[in-house]
Amino acid sequence: MKLVLAEKPSVAMSLSKVIGADQRGDGYMEGNGYLVSWCVGHLVELSQPEAYDEKYAKWKYDDLPILPEHWQYQVSASTKKQFGILKKLMQRKDVESLICATDAGREGELIFRLVYHQCGCKKPVERLWISSMEDSAIREGFQKLRPGTEYDALYEAALCRERADWIVGINATRLFSCLYGQTLNVGRVMTPTLAMVVMRDAAIRAFKPEPFYSAELKFRNFQAGGERMKEKAEAEKLVAECCQAGSAIITKVEQKEKSEKPPALFDLTSLQREANRQLGFTAQQTLDYTQALYEKKLVTYPRTDSRYLTDDMAPLVPELVSVIQQSFQIQPDEPAPVNAAQVINSKKVTDHHAIIPTKTAAGYDISSLPSGEQAILTMLAVRLICAVGTPCRYAETIVEAECAGQKFRTKGKTVTDMGWRQYAGKPVEDAEKNAEAGDLPELSEGMTLELAGVDLKEGKTSPPKRFTEDLLLSAMESASSDEFPAGVERKGIGTPATRAAIIEKLVQKGFIERRGDKKTKYLCSTDKGNALVTVVPEQIQSPSMTADWEEKLLKIEHGEYDSDAFMGEISSMVSGLVKTYEAVKGANVLMQPECKVIGSCPACGSDVCETANGWFCRDKSCKFALWKENRFFQTLGKQMTEELAKQLVNQGKARLTHCYSKKSNRYYDTTVHVETGEDGAAAFKLEFGGNK
């Protein structure tokens, strides 16, 4: 008996159907010599700091850094039942070996291995590694199972990624939270991503538009523009001179035959970028839709960083293109050309090939899919047809004219063969760059043309563009790429599988927010995000360092870098950060959340703000506090109210009436005075104004 362990129930059911495990058990399927079960995501996770020492339950600066010598793991509270099922299945005497069928990637490997080790299992493991959930791909995968030991390096890389994130996240979050008196979430990848948004927004705020001017010659069938000028008077003078001249001489006519190559197939990041541009989808939405399509056997594995197919897939491409073209009605009257060599390159495929629709998609009722999945599937189908198409060819004409001693220029573009663009429907990727400039009339050098008019054009320089998810994904993908040697396999921060989650986490934590209309949303930093980047040191927010870590993780995955050395570097960086970091002076003003101020602290003069529990001095070093659940006032039969707190803060005293004494069983009036000690802590004294 073999135990197959998938990542999700839906995947487990697809595998069970193909291998004949058709008898349902409690949390598993059984049949034909197989048991098939699932993990439901991360069943086993790293323990929190307090599991190592109870003192870590409270966040204290003096306890940092927290660097576990022996890592501890725990079963997720929400998935204990499924973990128990898996443990029993692994311990069954008739189970001789296991098949790891979690997602074929770094995180999928980690999910399986952590469960395997937490259960104390020692049985041999084989690996199912597939890029499609189609029945044929599953059958082939089970026929070509690989020894689990081949993926030990992949597991090491996953462990390093998880533990590095824990070390940086736990220590940096506690460090800055303790120093600045509020929870400040810091992450190995999250914070550099935030820093890019903050810096872009700062550049936009600092940008000062500069006006520019130019003269434009108007002919009967076209226009020609002159060079930009900073001074309006200079441009106006040129306009007047051109009007006086009344004509222009054609000094240059240059014609070139050009072509535009078909776009590459999609990897996850390029698909997310295109879906954001065309459809306004967030990166997470695109990943979710594509994952759903994958589990329905309609597209191949989504979390890939490759835009090519493997050499052995070349014979399959023509038939796939044909059935997809007909099924999706992509100009079906004439077969699309298929230049398969354009999309085939095994050397550029890492774990998984590019995302493409499957043959199953060709026979599927697409109208039954949710609209988001329909849109993504259609986008993938169109891209497949375009990617194997012929180049788009066009004639480009550059014309220069002279008038009043100045040069004017225009460009024309005439498409001679639409090629792949006839299937594209909507503009693809650099559409604005590829837009046609229009036809020009027949012109020759030396011709004199009468002017139909001369216009003064005014404009302003543009600020940097705000980040959309498209642009931020691009920035994450290429972060510090200029610092890496040519030929490295992956650059940037995060991975295709994690970038969407990073963006969503920044939004959820309130560091960035989405602004704009339904189609185009911009990612903008909040005050909270700006404040965090202000106080976090360069090594934490640097895309360069994070990209370097990502590169080393990839090398660990390929057995080219020592995992212990990597973890040592992470620990050293964090230890150095804790020892050397000093709180930024004045940053407490930036870090202060909005609150209702009731007055100035009688001890230090800072603002006194209301919170859920009372009224406290905003200066964290000052101990002045008026608790809402105040024992002193409760013994008087009184509750601390906002009005009472205001009187104590601003006047140093408050008059209380109808106070009750349990000892004498009598009511009385009194004046309560507030005094402060050296640390600012409040103390109360009563001044009696007579009994009642």
Predicted regions and their residues:
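Conserved ATP-binding/catalytic motifs of P-loop helicase motor domains
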Residues: P124, L194, V299
